[in-house]
Amino acid sequence: MLAEKAIGGTEYQKLYDMLSQFLGKKIYAFMPIEAGGVNSMLPIAAAARLGMPMVDVDGMGRAFPELQMVTFTIGGMKATPMALTDEKGNSCIFETITNKWTEELARAVTMSCGASVSVSLYAMSGKQMKEYGVRGIVTRSEQLGKAIRTIKDCGNRTPEEHFLEMSEGFKLFKGKIADVLRETRAGFNFGKVVLEGIGEYKGHSAYVEFQNENLTATVDGEILATTPDLISLVDTETFIPVTTDALKYGKRVMVVGLKCFHLWRTEKGLELVGPRYFGVDTDYIPLEERCKGGN
């Protein structure tokens, strides 16, 4: 969407003013709500524009498609008040009875505003952030980015071995994209990417289901990974992640699983982001157990 509908540039100051006035308190710092996609980068721009610090923490340790899907919800924190504005200057503040309602109302407004808005939410104390935030996630993202940029400088290891070591990932499959099925419903991108095995996986098949983010990875009919563990498709040569909107026929990818933040494996965490929440008829089993040691 941002390729067609860019950020205006005044949203950061407007959100800061709206939320601080509503709270009657000074806001001391920003943080990204998730470590994936543009939502990991905009808080950096906001902090730079307003001359304020950004904390090295987020609420997911990855990306999830809905606003209530954060570790702060596990801790009982409210998403609201939530300030919302678009690039035209339309704005509002929501107070909702649950974080799920925050998601529902924000998505409805977002679709009316052209499928892209800027929001500020989950105001909290430093103590709450320390207790429930995923610490060091920005630094971790920088480290992974550096590992990908220097993938050819890996000594006596192959680039693939270097990538898996740096990411602490489990290699689930390697294949060529044979088909991509997509459908847009209720403001989400649903779909499935089908893979034909290459290399050591030749003769095997796999598919990955997604709702904005990848939800399950299935190889030869056996589920090898599910949400909340992270499932990533990376280019087999550059090892740059391939987002769901960039999937296309013929592209060669490696399917990699990464362990999620420990709070997602609790009962409350799985209620929010476990496979059954997304309609997947399977119980959550940790990635490392499904892979029996993995790669």
PLM features: residue spans?
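Glycine-rich oxoanion-binding loops at beta->alpha junctions
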Residues: 1-28
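Short glycine/serine/threonine-rich phosphate/pyrophosphate-binding segments
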Residues: 12, 33-44, 61-65
